[in-house]
A protein has these predicted regions:
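Membrane-anchoring hydrophobic helices of lipid-metabolizing enzymes
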Residues: 1-62, 70
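Catalytic core of membrane glycerolipid acyltransferases/transacylases, capturing the structured
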Residues: 12-22, 53-108
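Short low-complexity, flexible loop/linker segments enriched in glycine and/or proline
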Residues: 96, 118-120, 175-179
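A membrane-cytosol interface segment of integral membrane proteins
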Residues: 101-122
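Catalytic-site beta-strand/loop segments enriched in glycine and acidic/polar residues
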Residues: 121-150
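A cross-family acyltransferase "interaction/gating" segment
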Residues: 140-213
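Long, non-transmembrane cytosolic or organellar matrix-exposed soluble domains/tails
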Residues: 196, 200-238
Length: 238
């Protein structure tokens, strides 16, 4: 049974991959949001949402391999991603169609160029998801924030629209070992172990970053997000 569900997962993305040429970018973004919601429903992943997003850089916490499905089910947007993903047969063309900011993480020149692009990014016209932690954190925790999105908001004048979301199943944790897990192994674990989870999502109040305030806003957002995570990200039986 789990093998059938795994095949459906790949069919899901293959279909999206084949549909890339037939939609405008805006139509494709709406399609992804619709499909992500259907995929979550199929796997009994109930998503509870409070609040509505406002225009700006979309900043969220990062815990699980399920995070991309959750955020795209709420609001489809691009993301900052390592350039290798662009060459993935299924995910690369889909991501490029949505609108990505590609970066070679081991290349200082590429990282600098990505920061410059981020500073000039129109976050209202082209929604962009950013995980300020830069990596996944353990279930119930929140890692330190990198300053990229906060500096970009300061330089561009765009608001930061934070989203904090909390799972109630520790098995979705992608950061407990402190090392990056293999994506495809995680997908196999999800189906083999029949992992189900609820997700509690909170659109927080947008934040303005004034001149010289990037660090201050980053610290304040981290403090606020951590309150939600420690309150709501708990195993279901706790």
């Amino acid at each position: 049974m789990w093998l059938f569900e795994l095949l459906y997962f790949f069919y899901f993305f293959l279909r999206l991959r084949l549909e890339v040429p037939f939609y405008s970018q805006e139509e494709y973004r709406k399609l992804i949001t619709l499909r992500a919601r259907k995929l979550a429903k199929r796997y009994n992943m109930k998503i509870y949402v409070k609040g509505e997003p406002q225009p700006g850089f979309l900043a969220a916490n990062h815990t699980s391999y399920l995070d991309p499905i959750v955020v795209e089910a709420l609001k489809t947007g691009g993301a900052v991603s390592k350039v290798e993903v662009r060459d993935y047969f299924l995910f690369g063309p889909i991501a490029s169609k949505v609108g990505m900011l590609w970066v070679k993480r081991e290349n200082l020149k590429s990282r600098t160029g990505a920061i410059q692009q981020l500073n000039q990014w129109d976050a209202v016209k082209d929604p962009l998801w950013i995980f300020p932690e830069g990596t996944t954190s353990s279930f119930g925790e929140l890692g330190p924030f990198k300053m990229g999105v906060f500096k970009a908001a300061e330089n561009s004048g765009h608001m930061i629209q934070p989203l904090v979301f909390c799972y109630d199943n520790p098995q979705v944790d992608w950061g407990s070992t402190g090392t990056e897990k293999d994506l495809f192994k995680s997908i196999l674990d999800f189906y083999k172990n029949k992992i189900h989870t609820n997700v509690y999502c909170f659109w927080m109040k947008p934040m303005k970053v004034g001149p010289g305030e990037a660090q201050k806003v980053a610290d304040e957002l981290h403090r606020r997000m951590l309150i939600y995570i420690r309150r709501f990200e708990k195993a279901r039986d706790e």
